[in-house]
Amino acid sequence: MGNADLRSLAALSDVSFDDLGGSVVAVDAHNWLYRYLTTTVKFTSESKYTTSNGEEVANLIGVVQGLPKFFEHDMTPVFVFDGAVTDLKDDEVEKRREQRQKYESELEAAREAGDSTRVAKLDSRTQRLTDTIVDTTRDLLELLDVPIVDAPAEGEGQASVMARRGDVDYVGTEDYDALLFGAPMTLRQITSKGDPELMDFAATLEHHDLTWEQLVDAAILMGTDFNEGISGIGPKTAVKDLHEHGDLYTVLAARGEHIDHADRIRDLFLDPAATDDYEIPDSIEPDIDAARTFVTDQWEVDADEVARGFERIDDSVVQTGLDRWA
């Protein structure tokens, strides 16, 4: 999920969706889905996001509600899905699993007590991306002709490499780790109602007089998904130490500290596993009727819940009048 402390280092500015027309955005699919599941559609009534068999379908509502924003502004979304979990992340994954189990126990108790406020809060904390959520999301995206890329490891790393190659214009994610992966321009808050926030990699480095390697070193000192940080080191101290000592290893030596697998963690950000097995299409032709049938008939989503979203997708295909949208 990244280190939120990076926000204080990031060069951020507001940008209007109206200024993003014609751009291609590599969306961190798991991050995008998680945001919708925990903040956007998770708080509708339970009957609207589960089937009669108890299968969760909030992700499908999220896709139908979230894609129009791209289409209406003539933006091409490319959804990048995570691959294998890096072994260095195993401890973090286990920690989150244990925390989720704790919340699930508390959630059950809150339900038994009839505490709806507590239930709503804990419901989002117990959210996880099941195989069904991922598979049905992919199926719906394919029906809507939205490009999909399968990353060999971190989806965010793959998206950032695509941006550095010039194959896409932006990375779309809430995580600040996109900076560490070297994404030139990142759009945050793309699931929010308003305009997104632009995170500028080059401006971040320039503002703090850091190299890319030093920015990664700063993050490692603070702590990443792959390691615990050094106690007492936040953004300001990390930058100060790097200006004084030059790199991660010299800082650690000066402080008498050690971080396991520091070389590997650096490489995970500076040279992430990535594939070139993808295509960015010149045109997208969503099969809206098939997508609607998939969502409402096969997965039992209330037709009224997604009617406006499909209408907006249909309208945007007509209104753009450009080759990208057939």
Curated annotation (Swiss-Prot):
Enzyme Commission no: 3.1.-.-
Domain of life: Archaea
Region (N-domain): 1-100
Region (Interaction with PCNA) location: 318-326
Keywords: DNA damage, DNA repair, DNA replication, Endonuclease, Exonuclease, Hydrolase, Magnesium, Metal-binding, Nuclease
Keyword Nuclease tagged: yes
Tagged with keyword DNA damage: yes
SMART domains with a match to the protein in the record: 53EXOc, HhH2, XPGI, XPGN
A GO biological process held by the record: DNA repair
Cofactor binding, note field: Binds 2 magnesium ions per subunit. They probably participate in the reaction catalyzed by the enzyme. May bind an additional third magnesium ion after substrate binding.
NCBIfam families referenced in this protein's UniProt entry, alphabetically: fen_arch
Family affiliation: Belongs to the XPG/RAD2 endonuclease family. FEN1 subfamily.
Stated name of the protein: Flap endonuclease 1
Organism, scientific name: Haloarcula marismortui (strain ATCC 43049 / DSM 3752 / JCM 8966 / VKM B-1809)
